[in-house]
């Protein structure tokens, strides 16, 4: 295992489309009482979601200790597992609120895998001093997943815990683990933030983060992560990927001659 090295530069992309079009997320003007508002389109028949459907797997169950999360289906069928109980949602059901510390995960409703799911997702502002699920978290989590799964590599648990902790999100241990939320919280902080920070795992990467200054502000608040708050890193990364893109274009031109 080793800290990830981004292979793509997607900072500033809006909408952000990942996994061969399996999901597309656009930033919307947020209401005054919300941390963010995203318009998402999930296509369960494509990319990573098609692989999950084929194997019967789901995205990781998780919880947020300091934020309410909200889902509203605009088109299609969405399932939200709430503490292990699947709740099927359609456009007729209105907005669904998921309280803090609720173990949950969303996915296209089984039996409707070929349908596109259009939905809104938002969350309340974080509590003072707490990490938050926000745009920076989603950009890095999706960026990391795409780099890993599109190349058939194994996911690094420390990297996931580092990103989740910085995004106010924690993996849910199995249902039979006593005090599972507290266990998940401790694992995220100790392994993701503390140990991960010492081993070189940053929670945010300039290649994927649109508001890099905001990410640096967040990392500077942690002794274990402040060394990753390099405000000039994004410009260097942009120039690096521009050079690589130019070299790729030249190589293609020479090959076609």
UniProtKB/Swiss-Prot annotation:
The annotated phenotype of a deletion mutant is: Loses the ability to produce yanuthone D. Also leads to the loss of production of yanuthone X1 which does not have 6-methylsalicylic acid (6-MSA) as a precursor.
Q: Where are the transmembrane segments?
A: none
Q: What class of enzyme is it?
A: oxidoreductase
SUPFAM superfamilies from the UniProt entry? RmlC-like cupins (SSF51182)
Its pathway is:
Secondary metabolite biosynthesis; terpenoid biosynthesis
Q: Which UniProt keywords apply?
A: Oxidoreductase
A Gene Ontology annotation in the biological process aspect, one of them, is:
terpenoid biosynthetic process
Q: Please state the Enzyme Commission number of this protein.
A: 1.-.-.-
InterPro entries tied to this protein: RmlC-like_jellyroll, RmlC_Cupin_sf
* Applied uses, from the record: Yanuthone D is an antibiotic against C.albicans, methicillin-resistant S.aureus (MRSA), and vancomycin-resistant Enterococcus.
UniProt-recorded name of the protein? Probable oxidoreductase yanE
Gene that this polypeptide is encoded by: yanE
